[in-house]
Design a protein with these regions (language model features):
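Active-site environment of divalent metal-dependent phosphoester hydrolases
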Residues: 46, 67-69, 93-99, 119-121, ...
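Conserved beta-strand hairpin/beta-sheet module of binuclear metal-dependent hydrolase folds
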Residues: 26-73, 162-174
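Acidic/histidine-rich helix-loop elements
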Residues: 35-44, 121-123, 180-189
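Active-site metal-binding motif and surrounding structural segment of the metallo-beta-lactamase
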Residues: 55-57, 68-112, 207-210
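Divalent metal-coordination and catalytic microenvironments
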Residues: 30, 52, 62, 77, ...
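Sec-dependent N-terminal signal peptides
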Residues: 4-13
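Metallo-beta-lactamase
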Residues: 19-22, 26-27, 57-58, 65-66, 107, 112-213, ...
């Protein structure tokens, strides 16, 4: 059921330690994947964030993996659409998802995370979101809608997904791994027993999914 999303090929080579540029690829005219990079145990990984373009502004789902790219992404989106980022939703507490929400809080951009994610962030001495996600609520921003849902533990105890009913697209975050994934990535906070059960619940809830990111 999971359809792999084709990302823009990386062009050229980069010196050791240099941050790879943000890669953006469309799902449709309003929904996009953006890809950032980091390494874990000497292996390079990508992180797929998403953003939704509405007539009131851009909703960001997860932050760039590198904090140095937060402002870069904001500027890219403003230049491309002439619209500001109007909200940031974090799908769990890790650096490639919630990162450092203080950047957005300081810009008075509304930030959202679940109570569990915020408790994890607070425990780690990191900035928490300004608003708490209401799971199952249909969020409306301009002409677009989406729902943030929790089906159980997997990659982390707080991993949530985002459902875009108009497009039948699911942002699975780190809960969903691509068919080409060679491993589960970081499992230090994972519940590998419950993980497949959680995914099964998700699929049962959304049998009409057209695309998973």
């Amino acid at each position: 059921m999971k359809k792999l999303f084709s990302l823009i090929a990386l062009i050229g080579s980069f010196a050791f330690g240099q941050i790879k540029p943000i890669q953006i690829d469309p799902i449709n005219n309003n929904l996009f994947v953006y890809q950032t990079f980091n390494s874990f145990n000497g292996v390079e990984y990508n992180a797929n964030g998403m953003y939704l373009v509405t007539n009131k502004g851009i909703v960001l789902f997860d932050v760039p993996w590198q904090k140095s790219q937060y402002e870069e992404l904001n500027d890219m989106l403003l230049e491309k659409y002439n619209l500001p980022v109007v909200a940031v939703f974090a799908t769990h507490s890790h650096d490639d998802r919630a990162g450092d929400l203080s950047f957005y809080n300081d810009l008075n951009i509304p930030t959202y995370a679940t109570s569990l994610t915020n408790s994890k962030l607070k425990k780690e001495g990191k900035a928490t979101s300004k608003f708490e996600i209401e799971l199952g609520k249909t969020y409306k921003f301009g002409n677009e809608k989406f729902v943030v849902e929790y089906f159980g533990e997997g990659h982390t105890s707080d991993n949530v997904v985002v459902w875009f009913p108009k497009y039948k697209v699911l942002n699975g975050g780190c809960l969903i791994k691509g068919a080409d994934a060679v491993n589960l990535g970081y499992t230090g906070e994972a519940n590998v027993v419950e993980w497949p059960k959680t995914v099964h619940k998700l699929v049962a809830k959304h049998p009409t999914i057209k695309q998973v990111i």
